[in-house]
Amino acid sequence: LSVSLSMNPLYQKCLAIVIIGLILTQCGKKKSSQAYVQEGIKYSNQGNYDKAKESFLKAVEEDPKNLAGHYGLGGIYNLEKQYIAAEKSFKSTIQLDPTHYNAWYSLGYTYELMGKTKDAEISYTKYRRLKEKMDSIMNKEKH
């Protein structure tokens, strides 16, 4: 008598273990990039900047195009007086979204902290232009 494979109790146990394993790996999925950003913001608001930095780093690792992750990192780097790293983070934000006026302002502030007044003024000028355009658009939508 031949016993079919699907009726074999050992086969059924192995299959059950594989299915449970697949289900459990789905339950243990990594957080999304946005979830890491939200976590980073929460930690920043609590003054826990080391944890915030860790969360923002995970956000950009998970999604290198995450604007908020790069922007949050820039702020943390400024607090840590790591101005070159802050400059890089804000430039990454701007590269992904050239209209991100807060990133232009923050880049200007970083340049100011670095003593690069000409670069700071260029960034502040771009910030003001973008902010004025955004405010103009928002005012038109209100009326």
Model-derived features: where do they sit?
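Terminal, low-structured helical/coil segments at or just beyond the last alpha-helical repeat
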Residues: 112-143
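Structural marker of alpha-solenoid helical repeat scaffolds
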Residues: 28, 62, 96, 129-130
